[in-house]
Swiss-Prot record:
One of its GO terms (biological process) is peptidoglycan turnover. Keywords: Cell wall biogenesis/degradation, Lyase. Its EC number is 4.2.2.n1. Murein-degrading enzyme. May play a role in recycling of muropeptides during cell elongation and/or cell division. The gene is mltA. Transmembrane segments: none annotated. The keyword Kinase does not apply. This is Membrane-bound lytic murein transglycosylase A homolog. One of its GO terms (cellular component) is outer membrane. SUPFAM superfamilies: Barwin-like endoglucanases. Pfam families: 3D, MltA. NCBIfam families: PRK11162.1 (NF008366). CDD domains: DPBB_MltA-like, mlta_B.
């Protein structure tokens, strides 16, 4: 009888140990899963925007120079937009001139409205975009065999243009070809980014190809396809990992993947030397963001706590404070999501490709 009781007690203790072990493992996994992308869990936010009287942040701004340059470009290129937001712009300029702390914004009549994020804990999705430089030729030669198209003129305004697969198979006339690149995936990336600089080589000036039109077919994320197929883990998906996948697959396999996205972007050659957002204002790297304008008005200033990444794109559990201005939109930028403009070229592209993270954001108002 005594031995039976002892065995029952031991079993209960073992069960408790197992339960505690499972709770610990679950907690560690949950914490790791939700912090390797910069997510934070503090107060729950019930409103889309919650007025915060004061934030206790001692970090300094890291992009003051870029922010001031971006403000100047708004003033020059869009006086109307500047005028609409002049009260908040002037208040921020006074705050910067006094070299005041972030937790002193309220002393300058600046109100902070924290965004609820994707999960009501303030975690706003942060991605990056950039302007690629694509090597190309005006004629088809050597490795330059992948056409970049302008908008076909023989279609009605709201008519669906050919889908990607048909275009790849030569449906459009050659007269609509602007240039030939040496990389199908680079053409695709330029479509995703919405524009790009074309490098014809021989030290010729770069030519800017701007967005002209879509073919009106639905957009399908090739990243989601690669995740579903088990080629790339969801936590690792980025433009960099997609490009890496391409380097290990044949051209036919790459084309088959891209054809699953029926949407296609056409371009137009322009004389612009700077990259413009939808606001018709030149974008300054690390100062401009693309937003969902049904959530954030164009011209709005947002204070954002952005995760810091190492050279391999790994979050190092540190954050930097940025002042960003909403000057662009994007087809896949929906809801509580910012796309931070990273600049021009390969280095900017690598950084933009890393970002699929989360940070706190406060819209600044008077």
């Amino acid at each position: 009888m005594l031995n039976s009781c002892i065995n029952k007690i031991k079993k209960k203790k073992n069960i408790k140990k197992i339960i505690l072990m499972l709770i610990f493992i679950f907690s560690v996994n949950f914490f790791t899963k939700n912090t390797n992308q910069g997510k934070q869990y503090e107060d729950k936010l019930n409103k889309d925007f919650t007025n915060i009287k004061k934030i206790n942040i001692k970090n300094k701004l890291v992009n003051q120079k870029e922010f001031l340059l971006q403000l100047e470009k708004i003033k020059i290129f869009s006086p109307n937009l500047y005028s609409k937001n002049i009260s908040i712009y002037n208040a921020i300029l006074k705050w910067l001139k006094k070299r005041a702390e972030i937790n002193e914004l309220n002393k300058f009549r600046i109100k902070l409205f924290q965004m609820k994020g994707v999960d009501q804990y303030g975690n706003v999705k942060i991605t990056g975009y950039y302007t690629p430089i694509v090597k190309a030729s005006k004629i088809k030669k050597n490795n330059f065999i992948y056409p970049i198209y302008r908008t076909p003129s023989n279609f009605k305004k709201n008519e669906k243009l050919p889908q990607r697969k048909d275009i790849y198979n030569g449906f459009l006339k050659k007269e609509y070809i602007l240039a030939y690149s040496d990389s199908l995936i680079n053409n695709f990336i330029m479509e995703i980014q919405g524009s790009g600089f074309i490098d014809y080589g021989d030290n010729k000036p770069l030519i800017f190809f701007g967005y002209a039109k879509k073919n009106n077919w639905p957009y399908t994320s090739i990243g989601q396809i690669l995740i579903k197929n088990g080629d790339i883990q969801k936590k690792n998906i980025s433009m960099n990992t997609i490009k890496n996948w391409c380097t290990h697959h044949t051209q036919k396999e790459i084309q088959n993947l891209l054809e699953k996205n029926k949407s296609f972007v056409f371009f137009q050659e322009t004389k612009r030397k700077e990259v413009y957002g939808s606001s018709a204002v030149p974008l300054v790297e690390k100062a401009a963001i693309a937003v969902d304008k049904s959530v954030i008005k164009i011209g709005s200033v947002v204070l954002v706590k952005i995760p810091v990444l190492d050279k391999n794109g790994i979050f190092i559990h540190k954050y930097e404070m940025h002042l960003l201005i909403a000057l662009d939109v994007g087809g896949v930028i929906k809801g509580q999501h910012f796309d931070v403009y990273q600049g021009i070229g390969e280095k900017a592209g690598k950084l933009a490709g890393f970002y699929n993270h989360y940070g706190y954001a406060w819209v600044l108002k008077i």
